[in-house]
From Swiss-Prot:
UniProt-listed PANTHER family: RIBOSOMAL PROTEIN S15, BACTERIAL AND ORGANELLAR, SMALL RIBOSOMAL SUBUNIT PROTEIN US15M
Designated gene of the protein: rpsO
Organism for this UniProt entry: Leuconostoc citreum (strain KM20)
HAMAP family, per the entry: Ribosomal_uS15_B
Protein name: Small ribosomal subunit protein uS15
Family: Belongs to the universal ribosomal protein uS15 family.
Source taxonomy: Bacteria, Bacillati, Bacillota, Bacilli, Lactobacillales
Oligomer status and interactors: Part of the 30S ribosomal subunit. Forms a bridge to the 50S subunit in the 70S ribosome, contacting the 23S rRNA.
Keyword 4Fe-4S among record annotations: no
Keyword Ribosomal protein: yes
Length: 89
């Protein structure tokens, strides 16, 4: 259910702004998006898993806050990121 370390490292390499970047908003949003997508698949098969549902809602809230931060600080990076991730904003 959780992302494997290899998959997480791939995402970090793809969205990092510089070498060793693991904490930028883009990387955090990309990792959360991958987690959210996996949890959505899990929730489709396990509709009554309320503990996972709560975790999904917390991850969505965290991603929303990071997206808001990025939009307010650098609108161009925000637009590029949502296009790359395929988010509906």
């Amino acid at each position: 259910m959780a992302l494997t370390q290899e998959r997480k490292n791939e995402i970090i390499k793809e969205y990092a702004r510089h070498e060793g970047d693991t904490g930028s908003a883009e990387v955090q949003i990309a990792v959360l998006t991958a987690d959210i997508n996996e949890l959505n698949v899990h929730m489709a098969a396990h509709k009554h898993d309320f503990h996972s549902q709560r975790g999904l809602m917390k991850k969505i809230g965290s991603r929303r806050n990071l997206l808001r931060y990025l939009r307010n600080t650098d609108i161009q990076r925000y637009r590029e990121l949502i296009q790359r991730l395929g988010l509906r904003r």
